[in-house]
Amino acid sequence: EVYGKVTPADLKGKVVLVSLFATWCGPCQKELAEVEKTLYPSYKGNMDFRLLVIGREHTDADLKKYNERKKFTFPLYPDPKREVFSLFADQSIPRAYLFDKEGKLVYSASGYSPEEFQQLLKAIEKALK
């Protein structure tokens, strides 16, 4: 796998952002560009935060090829059979789910807009306090 496996133990006690996307989704591309530009640089060194960007219907090979073009510095995780996606939704991307350190869902969004992304950043800050 491109970035290894993530286990529940890896996430315990951390603020976790699950971002679901597809390589062919226009709004997803805008959101991921913003993740690369603002969100990831701000939080990549924070040991209390985990970012899980999950490619719906994509394999490791798909994501490697995609990231050769995009050059994202954050990890991309495959979900070729929609196993993770199906835990959250049955359609519509991008989707973002933010969980606090206790594992409680504290923010969710479907679709992308700059305003919504700012709300997400505020929710992350609040969850990390």
Write out the residue ranges for each language-model feature:
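Thiol-/selenol-based redox modules, centered on thioredoxin-like
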Residues: L98-K129
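Extracytoplasmic/secreted envelope proteins and their assembly/folding machinery
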Residues: P8, L32, E36, Y40, ...
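Conserved redox-active cysteine motifs that mediate thiol-disulfide chemistry
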Residues: L20-K37
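A short beta-strand-turn-helix
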Residues: E1-V16
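A conserved nucleotide-sugar
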Residues: N46-L51
